[in-house]
């Protein structure tokens, strides 16, 4: 339907797609024996735009893939110390997304690059979770964090492992292509270890069964996820998400693993001819450096799961100096956060070096790592922050060592005194 003869001698042209005449549209473009109107062109552009975003955004996220040095530099801005772990993570993540690029352009006969999931081992409060969160922010990819302790086998009360993929989809507005190239961080992975080496007659619904379910996700499977709205739309088809290219990072404190490592590395013989060795007390940092896959299996992880996490990064225990740095140096440091809160009241915050060291010592004594720093400082400032909104003329709050060690109230400097000084 390209043209029709009207009552007059001139021909009226019609769009070959929608059938509208040249008088009903703004523009009619001619081709070889066909015509297309501006409205049909706009409609085609809209259809193409609706179908492209997920793929194009996923490409954009990796088009400017940062180098390992750039990834580490970003991590340095948020995580103090842990140099070996940051270097290991930077290289592993860079290689993972480089592998995805290779897969898109690879031919049939090319070498197939396999995925390398990551295991982070380190004491509580050493920065495992923060490293994973910062990585995802650096790469601009979908990220979700899951707690392994809440996971159970399918059919039991608790979270199914496929709920992790649903949360990943939610984080990127249900764009399947983007989710398939995201990062999943599973915390407390050590808490789902087998309770014993011998299989029990009772079901271990939150231990080995969960490990088996996670294994399927890690090695790559088609996960069926309810569409947006879930049960509200029971007639909708389930979304199929391929987990082959999702990077899994697992983290855990692995309390007790150091004993397994020591038993392996310091095994001694029995009898009169055996060499007598005194067991030296080693720090967690030194012990974790010697970790081998067999130690993780002995600890309670199934061999198949250990095999799916070839990259192992160990995090060191934080020293007093490192904790002082964490208090002040990172972009979102605890001291900077409290300074910002008090600045909203028009008050300056001064924390003296002796107080910073006292906070670090207290956190070390509590064995909470960097996670305990905020609670210690908050506890010292809670009464002051309660009174500040109703107290006038306060210019500065000063926290010294006695505030932390002896629970004395911080020193308040008033505006008149500040002017005289």
From Swiss-Prot:
GO terms for biological process: cell division; proteolysis involved in protein catabolic process. One of its GO terms (molecular function) is protein dimerization activity. InterPro entries: AAA+_ATPase, ATP-dep_Clp_protease_ClpX, ATPase_AAA_core, Clp_ATPase_C, Clp_protease_ATP-bd_su_ClpX, ClpX_bact, P-loop_NTPase, Znf_CppX_C4. ATP binds at residues 123-130. Disulfide bonds: none annotated. Zn(2+) binds at residues 15, 18, 37, 40. Keywords: ATP-binding, Chaperone, Metal-binding, Nucleotide-binding, Zinc. GO terms for cellular component: HslUV protease complex. CDD domains: RecA-like_ClpX (cd19497). Residues 3-56 form the ClpX-type ZB domain. The keyword Metal-binding applies. PANTHER family: ATP-DEPENDENT CLP PROTEASE ATP-BINDING SUBUNIT CLPX-LIKE, MITOCHONDRIAL, ATP-DEPENDENT CLP PROTEASE ATP-BINDING SUBUNIT CLPX-LIKE, MITOCHONDRIAL-RELATED. Belongs to the ClpX chaperone family. Component of the ClpX-ClpP complex. Forms a hexameric ring that, in the presence of ATP, binds to fourteen ClpP subunits assembled into a disk-like structure with a central cavity, resembling the structure of eukaryotic proteasomes. ATP-dependent specificity component of the Clp protease. It directs the protease to specific substrates. Can perform chaperone functions in the absence of ClpP. This is ATP-dependent Clp protease ATP-binding subunit ClpX. The lineage of its organism: Bacteria, Pseudomonadati, Pseudomonadota, Betaproteobacteria, Burkholderiales. The gene is clpX.
